[in-house]
């Protein structure tokens, strides 16, 4: 099964991902956790270009295509091989990030970005996506705790950009209710984790029941 975690920076998705992996492994599932951009040697090199603070003058389409190129490398070399071995793959970001950040916030257009992604990625979709919905104030507070030195080029975007990203995510949730489930990420990390693991275990049971019939 292929699961993705989506949301604004500071939503707690990365911390929750690690806790979910620990619990699934306790239940004897094989789990691979990975991230985007990156998750593979070449994809990680592309990540450095995308997030480098020196590259502030990057064109919106250049940014989008770099994300998609990194994603395809990650998909072909890491995600697909793991899925073929029946390993549960959980990725910190995937296609919905590009739809929200570049399609919505960069004003390229979600439909156009998704058309390119469908061509390159051959319409590969996650089985389940969790959207970690957090308020701007809570996200900013968590980002400050992370420290100034951890900020990358996208972290430093202005609030109007982040608002567009958030609205882009809400539109994705609205248009993909079966695949994308919302997590209230304003709560403390244990409550956020409890929401996430409940949804994931239900999906796993659903898949196991379907394959056994």
Curated annotation (Swiss-Prot):
GO CC aspect terms: cytosol
EC number in record: 2.7.4.9
Keywords: ATP-binding, Kinase, Nucleotide biosynthesis, Nucleotide-binding, Transferase
A Pfam family annotated for this UniProt entry: Thymidylate_kin
Entry binding sites for ATP: 7-14
GO molecular function, one term: ATP binding
GO BP: dTDP biosynthetic process; dTTP biosynthetic process; dUDP biosynthetic process
Keyword Kinase part of the UniProt annotation: yes
InterPro entries, alphabetized: P-loop_NTPase, Thymidylate_kin-like_dom, Thymidylate_kin_CS, Thymidylate_kinase
Reaction(s) this enzyme catalyzes, per UniProt: dTMP + ATP = dTDP + ADP
Membrane-crossing residue ranges in chain numbering: none
Similarity-based family: Belongs to the thymidylate kinase family.
Known role: Phosphorylation of dTMP to form dTDP in both de novo and salvage pathways of dTTP synthesis.
UniProt-recorded name of the protein: Thymidylate kinase
